[in-house]
Amino acid sequence: MAVGNNTQRSYSIIPCFIFVELVIMAGTVLLAYYFECTDTFQVHIQGFFCQDGDLMKPYPGTEEESFITPLVLYCVLAATPTAIIFIGEISMYFIKSTRESLIAQEKTILTGECCYLNPLLRRIIRFTGVFAFGLFATDIFVNAGQVVTGHLTPYFLTVCKPNYTSADCQAHHQFINNGNICTGDLEVIEKARRSFPSKHAALSIYSALYATMYITSTIKTKSSRLAKPVLCLGTLCTAFLTGLNRVSEYRNHCSDVIAGFILGTAVALFLGMCVVHNFKGTQGSPSKPKPEDPRGVPLMAFPRIESPLETLSAQNHSASMTEVT
């Protein structure tokens, strides 16, 4: 029910947010936790060839020894788009030229009799909430792919340490399905079976593309033509270099990184285009009046002027009719 031109009353927005949105978000976070921190989902044991050169790369060490550690990656992934959204929304709300268009797209929601949700708060919660949901959803997709495929990392044979003197490894072209042939550290071997798709590549491109879509859709700069392209391309380049780092350190195959890029891109495009509608307001742009159909416009009536030829023709026709009768 509308209250004013820029205010709309809604009794369902708060219950929907608490009992629907937060429940879905909590379930997504819980599922991501089970994939990351528990052994609920067992990794598929994939076979290998004992003399496979693609799996004999040197062991690069634990993830904490990588050039891009998981802690740094997750902090940057979460903080960068969130900071961009906060800065962008606050700037647009307090700049007069952009505030008018923002208020035209978003109405202030009145919940109950006293609580107002202004457009600034609604947009920040919407965009950051969707981003967080997509981040956990991407993590779930990646973990599910790694668990189902059990694709081996480039350094798998280095940490597996198979018994090359056994009968199974004597033949160069014999495929080994027995996972018990490995003699290395079981925990390291378990992580070496989770290569496809690359988690670093998927999460980094998702975060970078989501931030890029927000910048290009909402931030308007009339004085500079290169500020937005430099910021967007720099963000995407960082994600691209993150994937290349995984290949250079022999932690993932090229195909793993490409699959991660495709997965993260798909999630970001879906959420950005279909869920937040290119970061536009829920009211949309004000509708323009439709032009009148020219066929429906009444014509101006003019007095009829009878020509002399028509008068003479009518007289001749009446005379001929009289003769016939």
From Swiss-Prot:
Q: Which domain of life is it from?
A: Eukaryota
Tell me if Zinc is a UniProt keyword of this record. Answer: no
Q: Where are the Phosphoserine modifications?
A: S307
Keyword presence, Transmembrane: yes
User: Which membrane topology describes this protein?
Assistant: Multi-pass membrane protein
Task: Name the protein family.
Answer: Belongs to the PA-phosphatase related phosphoesterase family.
Q: What is this protein called?
A: Phospholipid phosphatase-related protein type 1
**Species of the source:** Homo sapiens (Human)
